[in-house]
Amino acid sequence: MIDADLIVAGAGPAGLATALYAARAGLRTLVLDARPSPIDKACGEGLMPGAVRALRELGVHPQGQAIRGIRYTDGQNVVDAAFRHGPGLGVRRTTLQSVLLDRAKDAGVELVSSRAQDVRPDGDGVSVDGRRARYLAVADGLHSPIRRKLGLNLATDTTAAPRWGTRQHFAVAPWTDLVEVHWASRSEAYVTPVGPDLVGVAVLSSVQAPFAQQLEAFPALSKRLPLSGASSVRGAGPLLQQTSTRVAGRVLLVGDAAGYVDALTGEGIAVSLACARALVDCVAADNPRAYERRWLAASRRYRTITSSLLWARRQPILAPRIVSIAARLPRVFDAAVQQLAH
């Protein structure tokens, strides 16, 4: 007996967007997640203009702060690039997940408070803890347990230091309508306006240290922030996660579970939305094999730009000059930002 056309494992943004696209395609859809909502995690919380447009097409309109563009600064050099095709949006992760969840319920998606554990794919479908579907979309996060159980993990490069992300909010009015990226010797701090009196600060680094200690690398930023945060510190990592394939029979990976390079470019939600749409197209066409090609195409720009910037970040000669080079070549910086914003 078939319980659904598609079971989605994970009720984060990638999983819920997949469920919404599936419902729109007329597929019976079931979402499994045992975590209580709203689900929070370490996240830069900045939506690129392309992500804002994709969410609107799904009928999802989260409240947040308009973002006009991106600023890079290293304390001496500053370079800005404004989005050309509409604003981005700074929005709390919990707000985004809650709005997506409500929209999924309205669309007729069945939501079950249960963690997908016993996954058994076969030639005709997938059984998940006794529930049966034609396909399974795996959206259970960066360190996907299902991906690991199915043997789809690839070993990462051990010669490069792993990178980690941490995030905390501060009760202070945003001082700009740009996402500010502050560069230090071994880390970056992303400041995103997420409310009229609230900013989120996400630090990416190859150094593991308490959040307050991480902020010491950014003295100009630290002067603007209250001594105490307005939320608890959330962390994630190692960020680099590689997979052998996004398709294993009738099991398809989406979101961070499908593989992740780094959060340097802040494009995660936009890529997840594009890949969720591609996944549903392939499921609706009963052609899961096409998803690997569609995923590679949808994520190519993100993977190329992020990998290139990460490579530069790891070069002792280039790393201290990234912002100064961007400031001397503002048209190149602007072009890169427009590519990410698309």
Q: Model-flagged regions — what are they?
A:
Residues 35-58:
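Conserved N-terminal glycine-rich FAD pyrophosphate-binding loop of Rossmann-like flavoproteins
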Residues 9, 138-139, 253:
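Redox-cofactor binding/interface segments in oxidoreductases and associated redox assembly factors
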Residues 281-342:
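C-terminal helical "tail/cap" subdomain of flavin- and related membrane-associated enzymes
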Residues 7, 20-43:
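Glycine-rich FAD pyrophosphate-binding loop
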Residues 103-227:
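Predominantly flavin-linked oxidoreductase catalytic cores and closely associated redox partners
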Residues 1-14:
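Beta1/beta-strand and adjacent pyrophosphate-binding region of the FAD-binding site
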